[in-house]
Amino acid sequence: MVRSLGFVNRVLCLTLVIATFGATRSIAQQHHDLKTIVKGKMNKGQLLEKTGYVSFFNFARNTPDWVAWELTAAEVGGSLARKGFEFLPDEQLPKANQVMAYDYKGSGYDRGHMCPAGDMKWSVKSMYDCFYLSNICPQVPELNQRSWERLESACRRWASKWGSVYIICGPIYKKKSPEYIGTEHRIAVPDGFFKVVVSLEKGKEKGIAFYYDNIADNQPMQKAVRTIDEIEKLTKYDFFSELPDDIENRIEAQHDLNSFR
């Protein structure tokens, strides 16, 4: 396969960064807890471990069911620009599930990051990995570029304030037969998206969750607030089950946006 010069340059840069710097955390270091952060019955799919995040990819929908990562204050301070990085098929997946960038062409939907590029500016490898199409869902442009982006920015502020936050997000499918897009690979269009945010600062643990419809309307963050318990009922997942019960029960019942501000 012929690769563009830009692609080759990025690979060379990536190799250099990995070889010469210790800033990129290994998968084992980064994801010691993330692989078990979501419990419950999983659909037919594949667990994917990337630099910076872990996800579970749904083979039938060709979107992630969930994506989880820890965002630290140091990582928020990363300065790597997203310019020059391209959406790529994930070769860890079976060929039939390797969504291509052109599958979104003309669909009217944005390629919406679940783990956002703005959270992965701390290394070339983490930025590269977040552009795999296994980390992407079809999002209405107004949601992706406005309400959802505002929430992503808020999460970065919270990580800076509290030292680190754990984030889990993913699509919600309410219809039995969702809309599909894709020229070669069929990609299911979500009805909405959830995001769970938790700070585990000792003695000050707190949590909050959000749900946004995949629509063009402006959706204020305050109106999108949910408890983690509500999102668990919606997704049928159990988040943070390895926490002590008293802490888990307390943070999963919280819905005070002001506690994070």
Feature roles, as predicted:
Residues 1-30:
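Bacterial Sec-dependent N-terminal signal peptides
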Residues 23-261:
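Domain-level detector for secreted/extracellular nuclease and nuclease-toxin modules, and
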